[in-house]
Regions:
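Bacterial N-terminal signal peptides
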Residues: 9-17
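Bacterial N-terminal signal peptides that target proteins for export
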Residues: 1-10
Length: 195
């Protein structure tokens, strides 16, 4: 029997920006084949606005290190975690250069309770602009399924959500112990979400 764990999270954007500067070698030719996806949990008693400001500044630094574009969303419903960040990159050579450049910077004190990082492969991209809100989903399929069967199920779910939302991205876990698929679907407001 197939069991599927789905987490549906809704986010509001804090900041979003694109870095398409030809001076740093990035431009419309960027493939953005991968994304560094991170989730941050707000510490007990912490002011979310403080962490929000820190993450926006952190994402700006990530772009300065060489990521193609980065952004921050704040969780609104569905989980204890407080913020979702992402930074796109083309390949692991670019990621290696970014990590070497960022290693020299000093890390400040940790102001969040917990966080997780995942490197995801972009499988399908239909979100062409930063949506006002996103519904973020993670799908873990039963371990008895083959990789091809998991992908078939993810593709079916993606087709359904992409049709319903009018634009979604599909990702697959590219590094680490998870065998999950992820989706981000955009909408303009809750009236749009309800349709």
């Amino acid at each position: 029997m197939q069991s599927t764990l789905n987490q549906l999270l809704t986010f509001i954007p804090l900041a979003f920006w694109f870095s398409y500067s030809t001076a740093d070698g990035h431009g419309e030719a960027d493939s953005n084949a991968y994304v560094l996806h991170s989730e941050y949990e707000i510490a007990t008693g912490q002011d979310p606005a403080t962490l929000s400001a820190e993450l926006v500044e952190y994402q700006k630094n990530q772009e300065a290190y060489g990521f193609n574009n980065c952004g921050v969303y704040q969780h609104q419903f569905g989980t204890q975690r407080g913020f979702y960040t992402f930074c796109y990159f083309n390949d692991f050579d670019q990621l290696d250069a970014i990590l070497k450049k960022s290693a020299a910077s000093a890390a400040g004190p940790q102001s969040f309770a917990d966080h997780s990082d995942n490197i995801l492969e972009v499988q399908q991209r239909n979100l062409t602009i930063s949506p006002e809100y996103i519904a973020y989903m993670r799908w873990d399929f039963d371990a008895s399924l083959t990789l091809a069967e998991r992908q078939q199920r993810a593709d079916k779910l993606f087709d359904m959500f992409n049709t319903g939302f009018g634009g979604c991205n599909l990702y697959h876990h590219a590094w680490g112990g998870e065998m999950a698929h992820y989706m981000a679907c955009g909408y303009t407001d809750y009236s749009d979400f309800g349709k």
